[in-house]
Amino acid sequence: MRIVAFASTQQKELNMNQYQNILLAVDFSDHGQAVAQKAQSLAEQFNAQLHIIHVLDNIPMPDTPYGTVISLDEDSSDDLLETEKNKFIRMSDQLGIAAQRRWLIWGEPQQEIIRLAAQERIDLIVAGSHGRHGLAVLMGSTASGILYHAQCDVLAVHL
């Protein structure tokens, strides 16, 4: 595992003691646990609140507009959605993340991660990087999009 950190362009110097809210963006890839452990370690190191987001973009939800927060308390008739919810809840529980800092959202990952980071005043986004094309070869398309558009620092954990 290799770690690549990017400071936001608005921040003149990187002062990691200022991190109070860290957002872990998960996609449940094979190496996602390594990204989660890094985010948890940073949250502990800086005594920061750890938030978690998983953006559903692979499940057909024709009557659901992008940006809709999926309830973790309601059962769904869609088996794939229930599987994703259960993985998300299990990881959130393992990391000890409080319910009010858990975000399961239907939409486009880059857009929803950036929107939530601004909404929740996130200081650092931690995401895995495992893309295959263009700049994404280095970072992953979602991670590279977050890097260029987020208003906070981004930590890309190379998988």
Q: What positions do the PLM features span?
A:
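Gly/Ser-rich helix-loop-strand patches that form or flank binding pockets
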Residues: 1-8, 115-159
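Structural beta-alpha unit
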Residues: 3-17, 92-125
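Small/aliphatic-rich secondary-structure junction motif
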Residues: 14-70
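Active-site phosphate/pyrophosphate- and oxyanion-stabilizing loops and adjacent acidic/basic residues
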Residues: 40, 89, 144
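General small-molecule cofactor/ligand-binding pocket signal
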Residues: 53, 101-105, 155
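Generic structural signal for helix capping and beta-alpha/helix-loop junctions
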Residues: 60, 109-112, 134
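A short acidic, glycine-rich active-site loop
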Residues: 70-84
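Short beta->alpha linker loops
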Residues: 83, 104-108, 130
